Structure formats: structure tokens, C-alpha cells
Amino acid sequence: MKEAKIENIDFGNALSERYLAYALSTIMSRSLPDVRDGLKPVHRRLLYAMLQLRLEPNSGYKKCARVVGDVIGKYHPHGDVAVYDTLVRLAQHFSLRYPLIDGQGNFGSIDGDNAAAMRYTESRMTEICTLLMVDIEKDTVDFRPTYDDSDLEPVIMPASFPNLLANGSEGIAVGMATNIPPHNLHELCDALVHLIDHPKAEISDMMNFIKGPDFPTGGIIIDKAELINAAYSTGRGSFRMRSRWEKEELSYGTYQIVVTEIPYQVQKSKLIEQIAILLKDKKIPLVSNIRDESTDIIRLVIEPRDRGCDPQIVMESLFKLTNLESRIQLNMNVIGSNNVPRVMNILEVLQEFLAHRQNIVTRRSTYLLNKIKHRLEILEGLRIAYLNLDEIIKIIREEDEPKAIMMERFKLTEIQVEAILNTRLRSLRKLEEQEIINEHSNLQKQQAILEEILNNPKELWKIVKKEIKAVQTKFGLNTVIGARRTSFEEVTLTNQVVDITAFITKEPITIICSKMGWVRSLKGHNTDLSTIKYKEGDAEKFIIEAYTTDKILIVSSEGRFFTLLADNISKGKGTGESIKLLVDIGNNDITNILVHKSDQLLLLASSIGKGFLVNSNEVMAQTKTGKQIMNVPDGHTCIACLPVNGDSIACIGESRKLLVFNIDEIPEMKKGQGVTLQKFKNAKLLDIKIFNKEDGLSWNNNGKVKLEKNIIAFLGKRGSTGKLPPMGFHKNNRFSS
């Protein structure tokens, strides 16, 4: 038995080499498209398998299971689910601007519904798909062995139209990603023709033709032209996109808003669900209802709460809170013709495509020229055979080795003799000299044209230009599939803040929050609290007088702020609803609840003895998850959030030391841990109080208010330890019992 050889290598080097190999495989063979045909390997193999199955646009459909089986069996040794998902996407009219596959059956929907199983669906290629593989049989591209060396597959497709930009691409590799939106083919062809006529054209020239993305789902791009051009100049950027909507007048002066197009890759069902949740949470008070009346076309009906609402303001509030407005990324990271992945700008992508087409036309012309030369050689031999027909037939009949004799006797080449010998005697007898002469003459004319194309770059570029214009004619703006779907509009209302409180009647309310976190609101102020009932084991914790138009700040023990509209708090005399249904407070306690007042200073303090001042406008949260303002270490909590309505602060902790200092010693911050308020050793800060020094320090002791005017003994600098509190101070070391 042969002894095993064990080689010691560095683990780090081995790991890096293998990870690099994996990364390269992911980038080159899976995730990034080729700039020339806009396809990834799985797309290329799928379409080539359909070509081999002769699934032309005018042929019958075949089961998708048959197609997928051929792909994974011959070319792509991966899971059938991944291949079928690819096939489905190439057939979805809402995913691809120019679908490459014509599907029959259930291929999913814009609601996010899955396609039917591959055994039920059928497919064939679309007309534009055939343009990707036109002339592939004419030696226009290289082929390589398949994974098991049993067949050949194309390295690249001839691609007679710029599929990368026309249909876009998405992919996530290792350390890099690509995100290219679809574009209008007519505009791309215009840009390519201009680039052929003006090889030194710049990016700005291209942008005169390419206005921006053109999505299969339509929509409106609301960015300025300068921002769009800047994105294409670098190959990186993003586009803001909005749904298309219109106002429908109804009877009695009412109206409804109808959304007819939604942003690309937004699932309609999830969009409706998103709006419904906002309605339930009372986050969009301008809207009363939404319903889906879509058929083959999208029709989302939004009903305003009041007919006096400006529909533009209603939609602005929805754009701000929902995916009716979304951002589309641009990252043109592709594999170049040199097999190196990099980010290209729009000009470089177009130049790479034209270079590819130049190479395709050159290789096709060379192939056709060689075929013509081969045929001309054969025709010369057939003409000689016609002139010496009887003698040639005699040689064929009588000689055992007629090939050598014919080559020597008539000065024929081996190719010519093979052609004569492979022709039936009956066909030889039917040869007519005029037919041979005519075919020979026609082929010589074609030969001259092809030689001119190969020898004269101008003629070659004329052919490239002619073929691009042919594509433009077939799929241009005047066709159903070619008409631009996405429009452009510079929106000035995007940054407008919609004040939803303007649509709420201002009424006094009293907000009640219990110790167990149940919150409710009662009409009016000065409410009789004795009539309020709580759940068993629960009791009051916060009582706040506010108005329905107020915004309420909720501070959690982890230092996170939440914002609620007072009108959204449960109304009535029941036990209310859990605060956890309104905000994502988790298992944290509520430190305080207070009414938001613009530009008011708030003092935050934690049990570790630190704190800072923060402007109330900085703590406003826009989402249910809140906004982290005070960073609290593990094992500690945010113990206080108080409005600053005095000039001094008093601190007391577990050490039973009282410290008083000027509020001006505390800095104003936007977020963080803050500065040390009181110094402790193995103790925590328990309570703070803000007061005016000249009024004295007061505290509550078993229902009695006590006042200490002489506080000189407790004055100190911020960060000091303090001194024992005055006689009669409550034993719980807090300013309220």
C-alpha cells in the first residue's frame, strides 16, 4: 500500500487561498453579468438550452420541467429550483423590461405570488431573445467544454442588442455587488449610433439620448437631471421613484385617489399591507381606507378622510411613510471583456458593447467569407466536371481509386474531388453550366462585399450601425413593447413636512399610564381620578394633561425615546391598551411620559450617576422602534427625564448623600452617556430634582411637603459626592415617598 503523503502548510494561507478561489468563482461564475451580453452563466446556459430544444418564438411551447432538466443535466450542475426561478424571472413582464422567455401558465404576479410548479408551466423564447443568439452558429463566439466534457457551451452570446442596459441586472458576490436598472432600447440604440458616428463622444453626449431608467412597471423618477447624469458618470448612484396616481372625482364633491403604477420591485400586496398597518396605527390620519381593484392593470384606490384634504398633501404623507416612493440603486459593477470585474460608467458600457459587436461582425464576416471561398472552390471543380462529364463518370465507374486519378488528370484539389465524388451520378448528369456560372458570379460579389467589410473599418461599422437600427425599428418607441413607460418629473414637495395635526380637532385630554404599562386617554382636564379603574394588581403611574394635537414623548429605562400623537392613544374609560402595542419598548420600564414642547431643554440622568441636557426637538422619533438618546451601561437604567424649569439640580443616591449644583454645569448634547452628575462608590443614583435656588429645595415625605431654604451646606461642584440630607428627609432617598 502506497504511503500517504502529508504536507504541512500554514492554516491562514490555506484558508485565504480557498476563500479567494470561492470568491472568484462566485464573482465570475454566478453573481456578476458580462458587460457584452448582460447575462450571468445560468442565464446563458438556460437560453442556449432552449435554442438547442428549438423553442423558437413561432414554435410550440415545451414544459419548463423539460427545459430545466436539459439545463442542469447538460450545462448547469446545480439545483433545479434555482434554474426554474431564473426561468420564471426571465418570463415575468413586471421583472424584465424586455422579457426573454414567453411563458404559458402561472408565472407569478406583482403581488409576490409564486409561479406554478415547473411540471405545469410551459415556455419558449421571445423574439427579442433570439437576437441575443443570432448568428451563434457562424463562429461568432467561442465555445468551451461543459462541466463533464460531454458537450460545448458558448462563452458569450453574440447579443445584437445591449441586453445589460435594456433589461438590467442584479447580483451579490463576495465583497462586491451589482445593481443595474433597465433602460429604453430605442434610446440606447440612439446613443450607440451616435457613438459610432462620433467615437470621441463624452458621457454628457450619451445622456442627451439616455434620459434614465425605464422600468417595466412604469412610475415617475423625481430626481433632477443633474443627479441622474452624475450617477451615470460614475456608475454609482440612486434614483428616487414614485408611484403614478390620479384624482378621480366622485359625486357630492368627494374624490378618491387611484394609483396606477408602483415603483419597480415593490410587491403590491406588501404595499397594501404596509398602508393598512399605518391606518390601523393611525399614522396616516388623512386616509380613511385603501382597497385593491387591480385586474391586469394596477388600480389601488385610496379614500381621503375628508373631501377638503388636498390630494397632493395626502400623497406626500404616503410617499414619506410607504413604498409608494422608493429608491432604486445604480451600481454598474460588471465583468469586462478582459474578464476583470469593475464599475463602469455609461459610456464605458456602451463602448464595450460596440467593441463586442465589432468583433461579432468581424468573426461572422470571416466565417462567411471562408464558406464562400470553399463553395467557389467546389464550383470550379463542378464546372470542370461538367466540361468533362463523360470522362469523369467513366473514371468513377471503372477505377478503384478515382480520387487520385481525377486530381492528376484534371488538376483538381482534394476538396473539389470530394465534392464531385459525394455528388450522385444522377445529379452530376443534371449539372448545367449556366447555373454554376450564375452561382459563381453571385458568390464572387458577396466575397467582394465581405472582403471590403473586413479590410475597411468604415464598412464594418456601417454594418454594425445598420443592425442596431434594425433592432431599433423592431423594438422602438412606436411599438407596444418599446414605448417609454417611466417618466421624469422634478418634485418640489418632496421635503415638505405634512402637519397631520392640522387635520385633528384640538380637544383637552388626560393621558393615564399605569405601572404595568396600560395607557389610555380621557376627555377633558381636571378629571376625577377616583373613578378610574385598573387591572388587578395595577395602579396609576403617570397622569398627564394634554391636547389631542400634542405629541407625547415616552422615555424608556434604556434611554430610548418614542413619540406618539396624543389623538392616537386609546380613548374611553376601559383599561386602555398596552404601551407595547404602540411602541417597541420591549421589556423595559417607562421612565417618564411628557408632552413635547418645541426647543425645550430636558435633563436625562442614569443610575450610574451621569447625565446631560438635550433639546426636545432632538429626541423626536419617527418610527415605532424609537430613537436611542441616552447610552446606558449594562446593569444600569435611565432614571429620570425632566424638563429644565429651574436653575439648580439636586442629586441623591444609595449612599444617602445630597448634592446641589448649578444646572449650567451640565452640557447640552444630542446623545451619549453624558457627564458625571454625582460621584459614587459602590452605589447608584436614585433620584434628581430641578428647582430654583431662591425658592429652596422641597420634597414629599409621606404626603407632607417639606421645604429646606438653607441649602448652602449641600452646594458643591458637579461630580462631587455631596453630604447627608437634612433632618426629616425620607429614608427611601428620593424626593417623593
Curated annotation (Swiss-Prot):
- Domain Topo IIA-type catalytic per the UniProt entry, residue ranges: 32-496
Per the Swiss-Prot or TrEMBL record, the active site comprises Y120 (o-(5'-phospho-dna)-tyrosine intermediate)
GO cellular component terms given for this protein: chromosome; cytoplasm; DNA topoisomerase type II (double strand cut, ATP-hydrolyzing) complex; extrinsic component of plasma membrane
What GO molecular function annotation could you give as one example from this UniProt entry?
DNA topoisomerase type II (double strand cut, ATP-hydrolyzing) activity
Membrane topology, record value: Peripheral membrane protein
Question: What is its EC class?
Answer: isomerase
Which residues are annotated as site, described as Interaction with DNA? K40, H76, H78
UniProt-listed Gene3D superfamilies: 3.30.1360.40, DNA gyrase/topoisomerase IV, subunit A, C-terminal (2.120.10.90), Topoisomerase II, domain 5 (3.90.199.10), Topoisomerase, domain 3 (1.10.268.10)
GO annotation (BP), single: DNA topological change
The reply on keyword Transport is: no
> What keywords tag this UniProt record?
Cell membrane, DNA-binding, Isomerase, Membrane, Topoisomerase
In this chain, the site described as Transition state stabilizer is at: R119
**Record localization:** Cell membrane
Reactions the enzyme catalyzes: ATP-dependent breakage, passage and rejoining of double-stranded DNA
Q: What is its EC number?
A: 5.6.2.2
Q: Which PANTHER family does this UniProt record tie to the protein?
A: DNA GYRASE/TOPOISOMERASE SUBUNIT A (PTHR43493), DNA TOPOISOMERASE 4 SUBUNIT A (PTHR43493:SF1)
The function of this protein is:
Topoisomerase IV is essential for chromosome segregation. It relaxes supercoiled DNA. Performs the decatenation events required during the replication of a circular DNA molecule.
| Description of how the protein assembles with itself and partners | Heterotetramer composed of ParC and ParE.
Q: Which family does it belong to?
A: Belongs to the type II topoisomerase GyrA/ParC subunit family. ParC type 1 subfamily.
Q: Protein name, please?
A: DNA topoisomerase 4 subunit A
Organism, scientific name: Rickettsia felis (strain ATCC VR-1525 / URRWXCal2) (Rickettsia azadi)
The gene behind this protein is parC
